[in-house]
Regions:
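ABC ATPase NBD coupling module
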Residues: 69-85, 103, 111, 234-239, ...
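Conserved ABC ATPase "signature" region
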Residues: 119-138, 407-424, 534
Length: 550
């Protein structure tokens, strides 16, 4: 008997069919990935398996968990043998911020395993240790807000294991994590699923490379239909559907391996370039001895407030027109440095100068000169764009506020055209756009004032691979056509390899490596750079025809 059987599943919401006759299964001891872009129907299919469909959903077909029919049965009303554990994409939302981690683990251990409070408390520590949390007895006495993203995600896996189910569903659990933390989370999932006494796994993702690291089988969805399924390595070797082929090609382009191999072949040439004196453009950013520390929460009512150094004294020079990637794991100091460059925070020591003029937080009027020269591309455009404003008003807003001379309507159209949004988008509202369209809008809004530099914070981390590839290509084209410099903060060396000529690696608040991207990938010198490279998922099987051009 399979852990999960989905047969001819159809789901319609508001009269629109979103899942159209999906059929697949997850056997005992299997890890199966459900692959597809946003809107493919994969997450809605997972919601049906979990019994979490919206109230207005109309369903047909069958879903059996351990032989029990569960389609249309809410999770709370399912029998014990048909329960499904869940690992959510956003661990910050999944965990209760007002309850300590210990209590959140103890509750399912008592409910689903019948343990006493004392035994459950001990089992909670053991679970925390098993998923690789440091100082497990101490860390579970914290609140979720006191943990890093990777630690929270491992707590979510521990919670799922505490439920003692035969099936676990993980919905994009590593999308928001840096590659090193992602690898650790995947290792935990690998260790504690698909065993004789551990649950089978249905893994939802858009990333073939991540899927290939974890799963044995794959179900590929597009527009609510299953277009291909089978053993994941067989699909890699000979994808039958054009859509599958495109997903694999995009995944290959998003890995760093082809760049590393090419640059290593050119290593002697790169070393010669390194030794040669290159002509240098004018300095745009001169970051001198900047540092920043923040107060930590007090331990107890009268406890001493400790300070945490987010950025040790750092020097960095960025020249006009450069494309620079600042990479590192969570907590490396890269976002703190970006905030200082954006004048959103003050330095404790040192200064940031732009074209010889010091930049520091002040009122909006005093920073107009700087906002004209530098614009920001956010990680999550949905959180920065007013959902009730039209596209036209959103792109026009910085032109008006910064007093940019000229015909603003023409400038708006030019900016939208540059990012591939035609005039039909002018009167749409921000909440009517897809994730990729919203990111293009954020870029259009940033380039409308014709800045000298764009500062981008993880600009593609939340996007599907094909959309991620198109946004990176767009940023590169804008830089080449307009001479616009770009500083992009990311944990993803593969994205930086595709966009940036120079890469700065940060760790624990310090710059540990700063070289041309080609040289850094071909011959990484620092252990943290090597760790970032090693953590990037690799497609183990790949058709020669899909090799990307470099």
């Amino acid at each position: 008997m399979n852990s999960l059987e989905v047969t001819d599943l159809r789901i319609a919401i508001g009269g629109r069919t979103i899942v159209n006759g999906t059929t697949f299964s997850v056997g005992k001891g299997q890890r199966v990935c459900l692959l597809g872009e946003s809107g493919s129907g994969k997450s809605l299919t997972a919601s049906a398996v979990l019994g979490r469909l919206p109230a207005n959903a109309v369903t047909e077909g069958s879903i059996r968990v351990n032989g029990v029919e569960v389609l249309g049965v809410p999770a709370s009303k399912r029998p014990e043998e048909a329960r499904v554990a869940m690992v959510f994409q956003d661990s910050a939302v999944a965990l209760n911020p007002l309850v300590r981690i210990r209590e959140q683990l103890v509750e399912p251990l008592r409910r689903h395993r019948g343990l006493s409070r004392a035994d459950a408390a001990q089992a909670a520590v053991e679970l925390a240790e098993s998923v690789g949390l440091p100082d497990p007895a101490g860390i579970i006495d914290r609140f979720s807000a006191e943990l890093s993203g990777g630690q929270r995600q491992r707590v979510c896996i521990a919670l799922a294991l505490a439920c003692n189910t035969r099936l676990m569903v993980a919905d994009e659990p590593t999308t928001a994590l840096d590659v090193v933390t992602q690898k650790r989370v995947l290792d935990v999932l690998k260790k504690y699923t698909a065993g004789q006494h551990t649950p089978a796994l249905l893994f939802i993702t858009h990333d073939f490379a991540v899927a290939s690291e974890l799963c044995s089988d794959s179900v590929v969805m597009k527009d609510g239909d299953v277009v291909e399924q089978g053993q994941i390595h067989s699909i890699f070797a000979a994808p039958e559907n054009p859509y599958t082929r495109e997903l694999i090609r995009a995944a290959r382009a998003a890995t760093v391996d082809p760049y590393v191999q090419q640059f290593r072949r050119e290593l002697a040439e790169l070393r010669a370039e390194d030794a040669a004196e290159q002509p240098k453009a004018k300095v745009f950013y001169d970051i001198g001895d900047v540092s920043r520390e923040y107060p930590m929460p007090r331990k107890g009512l009268f406890g001493k407030r400790e300070m945490k150094t987010a950025l040790f004294p750092t020097d960095l020079v960025i020249r006009e027109g450069e494309r620079v990637g600042i990479v590192g794991v969570s907590g490396s100091g890269k976002t703190t440095l970006l905030r200082l460059m954006l004048a959103l925070d003050t330095t404790d020591t040192g200064a940031v100068t732009c074209s010889g003029r010091e930049v520091y937080p002040a009122d909006v009027k005093k920073l107009k000169w700087y906002r004209r020269k530098v614009q920001y591309v956010p990680q999550d455009p949905a959180s920065t764009l007013d959902p009730l404003m039209t596209v036209r008003k959103l792109v026009r807003e910085p032109l008006v506020r910064l007093g940019v001379p000229g015909d603003h309507d023409t400038m708006v159209r030019e900016a939208l055209d540059s990012v591939g949004l035609d005039e039909k988008f002018l009167h749409r509202r921000a909440n009517e756009l897809s994730g990729g369209q919203a990111q293009r809008l954020a870029i259009a809004r940033a380039i409308a004032t014709r800045p000298d530099f764009l500062l981008a914070d993880e600009p593609v981390s939340g996007l599907d691979l094909p959309m991620r590839e198109s946004i990176v290509a767009l940023l590169r084209r804008i830089s080449e056509e307009r001479g616009t410099g770009i500083v992009v903060v990311s944990h993803d060396l593969s994205m930086v390899a595709n966009l940036c000529e120079r890469t700065v690696v940060m760790h624990a608040g310090e710059v540990v490596e700063d070289r041309s991207t080609r040289q850094l990938l071909a011959d990484p010198r620092h252990e943290r750079t090597k760790e970032l490279l090693d953590a990037i998922p690799v497609l183990h099987v790949m058709p020669d025809a899909l090799e990307p051009a470099i």
